[in-house]
From Swiss-Prot:
Secreted is among the record's keywords: yes
Annotated protein name in UniProt: 56 kDa cell wall protein
Primary subcellular site in the record, as a coarse category: secreted
Organism listed in the record: Nicotiana tabacum
GO cellular-component term (any): extracellular region
Keyword set, alphabetical order: Cell wall, Secreted
Source taxon at top rank: Eukaryota
Subcellular localization, as worded in the UniProt entry: Secreted, Cell wall
Amino acid sequence: GEQPGDQARGARNPXGNN
């Protein structure tokens, strides 16, 4: 997502799921 490691935002915004 917007912040690395943010699973919730990372799901909709690829590149944030660390």
